[in-house]
Amino acid sequence: MVEPFPEKLAFPAASGKVPGFDSNFMSDKPLQIFIDGQFYSRGEAKISVFDHGLLYGDGVFEGIRFYNDRVFRLEQHIDRLFDSAKAIHLTIPATREEVCEMTLATIRENDLHDGYIRLVVTRGVGELGLSPYKCERASIIVIASTISLYPAEKYEKGLILATCATRRPNHDALSPAVKSLNYLSNVMAKVEAMASGAEEGVMLNAAGYVAECTGDNIFVVKNGVVYTPTVASGSLYGITRGVVMELVAEAGLELREVEMARYDLYTADELFLTGTAAEVVPVAEYDKRLIGTGEPGPITRQLIERFRNLVQTTGTPIYEKAFVS
């Protein structure tokens, strides 16, 4: 049986105020990070050197956005976290509702209204050696801060992409559906892309088809139809990817999930990426080839606007009320 967290943490109330703290002080105090039931300052937030998340990249994570005092698609992110954990035989020592409340509490503790959450579950402290059965308990870490993945001008002018030599791992190695802490292939692909002068890299699968970028899903517009690589191609079923697919349907546009070659990206009328941190960002150039006119196209701009309107008006309230399943 999983033991509950020690009762050392008083979750901030739904009003946004933490018992015993002055709200004016809260807004100026250093970043507070949630680790296993307690809040720590950035300088005090530490995990053991024997944590298997550090030693072996053994754990799972989610990146989550919040806008205008609402967490966007919180339940979907938490569900995916638990699915990833189940896939790697990792028991999260809390319920979905408790993890949701930990997330909301961390935002309240930092008195934030717009930002980014990094939710991490490590295998926990164990011994040297791969066996996860030496780890007694998983650790839950929540960081609520801000993020700016790309400069604002890139959302107006578009990114530069390049194909990476590092391939997306095969399904028979570790499913791309698992958001694990082992992101080394993505890191190496990012290094390759930036070394070539690009800002993001396109990762292919073992068969040479387009999978995704190092941290984002890919969409192509051709003759008014929107295309995206299939999940079977090695792309993550991104939360933002799913949202954009909904927005495409609402806009009355046709959407197709297909296998894509680099040729399909080279000859696209429009190309854009989606991700929690990136949101929806246009692409201007890929492998030294201009995409369309070299500027964000009308469908891309429409979807960016629809996405921004959606995230500002929907989501789980942070301060108005506590999470209700």
Regions found by a protein language model. Give the residues of each.
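Conserved alpha/beta cores of soluble small-molecule-handling proteins
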Residues: 2-202, 206-209, 236, 246-325
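Glycine- and Gly-Pro-enriched alpha-helical subdomains that act as flexible
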Residues: 201-202, 209-232, 237
